Amino acid sequence: MFDFEQQLKILPDKPGVYLMKNSLGEVIYVGKAKILKNRVRQYFQKSKNHSEKVRTMVKHISEFEYIVTDSEMEALVLECNLIKKYRPRYNILLKDDKIYPLIKITLNEDFPRIICARNKIKDGAKYFGPYISTGAVYETMEVIKKIFPIRDCKLNIKKGNVKVRPCLNYHIGLCKAPCTGHISKEEYGKIISGVMDFLSGKNKDIIRKLKEDMDTLSENMEFEKAAELRDKIFALEKIIEKQKITTGGFEDEDFINIHSDEKDSCIQVFFSRTGKIIGREHFIIEDTQDLPKGEIVANFIKEFYGGTAYIAKTIYVPEIYDVQLLEDWLSIKKDSKVYIKIPQKGDKKAILNLVEKNARTTLQNFKLKFIQDKKMYETSLEELMEILNLDDIPHRIEAYDVSNIQGVDSVGTMVVFENGRPKHNDYRRFKINEVKGANDYESMKEILRRRFQNGMEEIKRIKERKLEFSAGKFSFFPDLILMDGGKIQVSAALEVLKEFNIDITVCGMVKDDKHRTRGLIYRNEEMPLNRNSNIIKLITRIQDEVHRFAVTYHRSLRSKRVLHSVLEDIPNVGVKRRKELLKRFLSVENIKKASMEELISTPSIDMRTAESIISYFRGYKS
């Protein structure tokens, strides 16, 4: 039994990180402290200043751990890493941990290329962005390639040493073919300078020059070429139009603001590059009632910039906690000075107000859709209760599926819907261990046995310790079980429930010959469902989700197995390097497509190893 009184007494008066755990040993909160003794003790002192969220969390704390650091900066870095590792339920977590793509010009090559990059590294290249999506990157790159005839091949072209046959791009005017010596390094460099001017926002001169060329072609009655230039100008202006809002500066800036209602918050980020707003992103953060705005913004910055590939030079916010600490942390990550500013008036304040207005609108729309969806889900669940003759609405529904190819890499999955909505934190994946070959019936029984055996054991441990109930991985049992399949799958589930003496309604989800959800199998009879009903929409969504989750897990296992076996054959790639490649690129296809720069930027991969990998895949037949 954890002795709170004793552990609170011996807390050190040093900086560090603390981890709060529930009765099942799961980390439910990670925080940092300038003085551990003071910060951790605050949670266990009765105070009206505690938010509802903190009071709820404290009820579920069964023990805590702490890690002492040499400085508050070290504590901040460790806190960010541990939050990413454990994803604790009471920390502010962004719905997606995306890395925003960049446009990279490989100035470290004699004849540079323009490519999409995920990480910014010190390799002599020039980076622009970040962009809001890879779609925005490729759209911009396509326009650039139409206007500026630069190469997009992966040939290692050195000045004067490569003579090959030019590719199709040369013949259709999209490349000057430096691979054949048709253009000098100096002339090619002028084209690249134009690309960098465009990406830096110096667009007026480029458009003016294109229009002059178009007029000249028209005067010379070369109307076809003039029309081509007209289309290029239109495409260029279309890209520029998307960056119409200006910020009055020429540096890279991010504008962050927040709007909160009585329960939730929306944080909006505007990305400004060289004085133009190039994109925006929003994040809905739930259960922020009673939390100060400055604390929410500080926590958001830690998570958002902890994962992004690019940090702007200046970040504007309405208010914030730990501003100096966060500035220092961001500056270390960027390797140059980063400023966090709170504008009081002027253009920056006006833009920040615009960001807040957008956050307010986004939150209102989110809530409106939530209410509309809630009504639809309630209707669906009520209909489901009626047709199955249940005593109550099935608030928690669990669905199961099995996936394999000829019995190889057999996996099972469980998805959870609460009140009609997916509860992703409760999704579970199972490797089939005991069943050999393609046997869906026995595989399904293995999955369900493990699920309910784990649930019974968790509940027993909680009761034995006489602790307040805390949801573990399997502690909550469903009101309804849906099997992706027919009578065989339903029979497997009922047999396992009988073993555990558990009474839960089980249905099978069946599809028609067009692979659309058709109806439910219940008590050995098929119940057809109206294609326009709310209930079929819910069942279809659940069936599609459990199937997607199963297939995705199966593919990931298969990909890892194939990747592992392939990498074993590559010279200079040992166990450590295989792990790093797998961690970075995830699939064999991504490894095969990786550029020299991307491979070298992977931990433990040097130039010799990268060349070995590229050489191997040139001769590899998948």
Curated annotation (Swiss-Prot):
Q: Which UniProt keywords apply?
A: Cytoplasm, DNA damage, DNA excision, DNA repair, Excision nuclease, SOS response
On the tree of life, the source organism's domain of life is Bacteria
User: What SUPFAM superfamilies does UniProt report for this protein, alphabetically?
Assistant: C-terminal UvrC-binding domain of UvrB, GIY-YIG endonuclease, RuvA domain 2-like
**CDD domains under this entry?**
GIY-YIG_UvrC_Cho
Is-annotated flag, keyword DNA damage?
yes
Q: Where in the cell is it found?
A: Cytoplasm
The record's Gene Ontology biological-process terms are:
nucleotide-excision repair; SOS response
List each coiled-coil range.
Answer: none
GO MF term list: DNA binding; excinuclease ABC activity
Domain GIY-YIG: residue ranges: 13-92
Q: Which residues form the UVR domain?
A: 204-239
A Gene Ontology term for the protein's cellular component: cytoplasm
Q: What is its main location?
A: cytoplasm
Query: What SMART domains has UniProt attached to this entry?
Result: GIYc
Q: How does it assemble?
A: Interacts with UvrB in an incision complex.
Q: Which family does it belong to?
A: Belongs to the UvrC family.
What this protein is reported to do is described as: The UvrABC repair system catalyzes the recognition and processing of DNA lesions. UvrC both incises the 5' and 3' sides of the lesion. The N-terminal half is responsible for the 3' incision and the C-terminal half is responsible for the 5' incision.
Family annotation (PANTHER family)? UVRABC SYSTEM PROTEIN C (PTHR30562:SF1), UVRC/OXIDOREDUCTASE (PTHR30562)
Give the protein name, as stated in the record.
UvrABC system protein C
Task: Name the gene for this chain.
Answer: uvrC
